[in-house]
């Protein structure tokens, strides 16, 4: 029988993506994928990720928690939010985002098999 208790180490992720100023490692736990991303100072979605995905803004949704640093997000509709370390967040598709200040931003995001929730994927629904 399959065990109901399971752990995984970030030392052995299922996937690693390293676009400009970014290191993102993903671990699958059943139907849920956890992605731990480290964005360096100077990281901005529209400069570091946009060239790889070809959309005007990030078209992925995100649910996660910022573990370290600070990120500013501007939605396509003009609304803005700053995410601080320790805060959980949900971002709808259609936004740009960047690291604020000189500290790397480290976040942990959650997704399911039914939808992509990552800045480094196309995020198509």
Where are these regions (language model features)?
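Short beta-strand segments
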Residues: 35, 79-81, 106
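Short acidic-glycine-tyrosine-enriched beta hairpin
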Residues: 75-94
């Amino acid at each position: 029988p399959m065990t109901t208790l399971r752990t995984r180490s970030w030392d052995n992720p299922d996937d690693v993506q390293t676009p400009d100023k970014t290191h993102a490692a993903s671990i699958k736990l059943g139907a849920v994928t956890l992605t731990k991303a480290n964005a360096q100072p100077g990281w901005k979605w529209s400069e570091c990720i946009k060239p790889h995905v070809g959309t005007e803004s990030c078209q992925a949704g995100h649910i996660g928690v910022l573990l370290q640093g600070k990120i500013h997000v501007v939605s396509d509709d003009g609304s803005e939010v700053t995410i601080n370390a320790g805060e959980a967040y949900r971002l709808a598709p259609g936004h740009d985002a960047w690291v604020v200040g000189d500290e790397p931003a480290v976040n942990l995001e959650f997704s399911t098999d039914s939808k992509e929730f990552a800045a480094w994927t196309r995020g198509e629904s």
